[in-house]
A protein has these predicted regions:
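Short, solvent-exposed interaction modules
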Residues: 75-76, 91
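C-terminal structural segments of small proteins and small subunits
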Residues: 106-118
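Amphipathic alpha-helical core segments of compact helical bundles
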Residues: 50, 72-75, 104, 108
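Short runs of predominantly hydrophobic/aromatic residues within well-ordered alpha helices
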Residues: 63-66, 96-99, 115
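Short acidic alpha-helix initiation/capping motifs at coil-to-helix transition points
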Residues: 43-46, 76-82
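A cross-kingdom feature marking solvent-exposed beta-strand/loop segments within repeated
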Residues: 82-104, 120, 125
Length: 132
């Protein structure tokens, strides 16, 4: 099984006015990876998690991305899915300085080793951005 499952084929459309979506988020990774083997799981992944949940405008995408990064970090999930969600957070307006503060804050609740692993991924994602 590829560790890229759940971290590809998400089309986060153009944003306007900060984090306001102009089009829906579309996900196909579930169907692409597991459509024939686990069609119900693929449906929940693509249509419910990324379709309904990520398109719910009650929480803006920047906040939703921060929540997702912290949730994955707190579970110790430091594979490509966490890196992907760190990139999404960056794309939704989370600066390097904010990401460092978020990971540092979460470290006290989720654990220091998990923060180290998350910082390593965040450094890769933010490596081309000048420090703010």
């Amino acid at each position: 099984m590829s560790d890229d499952f759940g971290s590809r084929n998400v089309d986060f459309k153009k944003l306007q006015g900060g984090n306001k979506m102009t089009e829906k988020i579309v996900q196909t990774a579930g169907r692409d990876a597991l459509g024939n083997f686990a069609p119900n799981f693929a449906h929940y992944n693509d249509d419910v998690l990324f379709g309904d949940n990520w398109n719910n405008e009650d929480i803006d995408l920047k906040t939703r991305s921060i929540i997702t990064v912290v949730a994955l970090m707190s579970q110790g999930i430091t594979d490509s899915s966490l890196k992907y969600h760190i990139l999404n957070a960056k794309n939704h307006g989370v600066t390097q300085k904010e990401m460092a503060a978020i990971i540092t804050h979460a470290a006290f609740y989720a654990g220091w080793p998990k923060a180290w692993a998350t910082f390593n991924l965040a450094k890769e994602v933010y490596s081309e951005e000048p420090r703010d």
